Curated annotation (Swiss-Prot):
Name of this chain's protein: Transaldolase
PROSITE patterns assigned to the protein according to its UniProt record, in alphabetical order: TRANSALDOLASE_1, TRANSALDOLASE_2
GO cellular component: cytoplasm; nucleus
Compartment annotation: Cytoplasm
Pathway annotation: Carbohydrate degradation; pentose phosphate pathway; D-glyceraldehyde 3-phosphate and beta-D-fructose 6-phosphate from D-ribose 5-phosphate and D-xylulose 5-phosphate (non-oxidative stage): step 2/3
GO biological process, one term: carbohydrate metabolic process
Membrane-spanning parts: none
Protein family: Belongs to the transaldolase family. Type 1 subfamily.
Record-listed Phosphoserine modification sites: S237, S256
């Protein structure tokens, strides 16, 4: 006999409990941080790649990307662009060695208002993965959830069989447009919505169930499930484990290594909060959005307008920093020959 149930080992950790009803994704470019948490998928963005590219442990990848950019030749700008694309793919390829599922690789945020340029850059990234022996089935291309980005996602999915992850998603309008575009996955942000409300309203703290980021993702999840959209809802950008627990049951959640570590040490009981069944009871009504209606509805949400703009600027700024870093490495070395 193994003894009474009371004497059993303490409850399994919150991360393992969460994995029973939500697909857990690691939000990091630091692939050495992934092993411990055994996520299904992983997501990267320009800021995470910039941070990882500055770590001593990843300098071989940076050197390989620089060599690739040089080998293809062309102008300095072309060499740097090719080196950056290669760097993103090198990190993605290493991450894929650690996970069974897919990695998300982001298109340069400076293209966020140029549909055709986003499509071209996405296809280029997929081509680079193919050169590395990785099929497009294991890649999600991340695009900003501007109107142009959403239409780029629609084109990539329908005409090129390239799966997309729509990021920087803050408004219900963005979520509805993504569902109608038939993209594979959306990443509605939680923590950045909370940040905005703390900074711009008199209320400085929230109970988890009243957290505006949690409420936003809950509404989007319920809408998608109620109306039968196949697009995966992946909550992103968390400030604490309370937000994660409040969204247990969501299709996917992408979580930083720091918060994955906290969940690993947490042995409190976790129960699913979101479910497709409960979503059927929500009082949401179906809406359809053409471009004009999308722009109006999104523009009515001050938080979403400000956070989308801010998010694009931040990712663009980190892309510029990455370019500067590679330019110094590529061309100062060349000048010193």
């Amino acid at each position: 006999m193994s003894g009474s149930p009371v004497k059993r080992q303490r409850m399994e950790n919150a991360l393992d409990q969460l994995k029973q009803f939500t697909t857990v994704v690691a939000d990091t470019g630091d692939f050495h941080a992934i092993d411990e948490y055994k996520p299904q998928d992983a997501t990267t963005n320009p800021s995470l790649i910039l941070a990882a590219a500055q770590m001593p442990t990843y300098q071989e990848l940076v050197e390989e990307a620089i060599a690739y950019g040089r080998k293809l030749g062309g102008s300095q700008e072309e060499q740097i662009t090719n080196a950056i694309d290669k760097l993103f793919v090198l990190f993605g390829a290493e991450i894929l060695k650690k996970i069974p599922g897919r990695v998300s690789t982001e298109v340069d945020a400076r293209l966020s208002f140029d549909k055709d340029a986003m499509v071209a850059r996405a296809r280029r990234l997929i081509e680079l993965y193919k050169e590395a022996g990785i099929s497009k089935e294991r890649i999600l291309i991340k695009l900003s959830s501007t109107w142009e980005g959403i239409q780029a996602g629609k084109e990539l999915e329908e005409h090129h069989g390239i799966r997309c992850n729509m990021t920087l998603l803050f408004s219900f309008a963005q979520a509805v447009a993504c569902a109608e575009a038939g993209v594979t996955l959306i990443s509605p942000f939680v923590g950045r919505i909370l940040d905005w409300h703390v900074a711009n309203t008199d209320k400085k703290s929230y109970e988890t169930q009243e957290d505006p980021g949690v409420k936003s993702v809950t509404k989007i999840y319920n809408y998608y499930k109620k109306f039968g959209y196949k697009t995966i809802v992946m909550g992103a950008s968390f400030r604490n484990t309370g937000e994660i627990k409040a969204l247990a049951g969501c299709d996917f959640l992408t979580i930083s290594p720091q918060l994955l570590g906290e969940l690993l040490k947490d042995h409190s009981k976790l129960t699913p909060v979101l479910s497709a069944k409960a979503a059927q009871a929500s009082d949401l009504e179906k809406i359809q959005l053409d471009e004009k209606a999308f722009r109006w509805l999104h523009n009515e949400d001050r938080m979403a307008v400000e956070k989308l703009s801010d998010g694009i600027r931040r990712f663009a700024a980190d892309a510029v920093k990455l370019e500067r870093m590679l330019r110094e490495r590529m061309f100062s070395a060349e000048n010193g020959k």
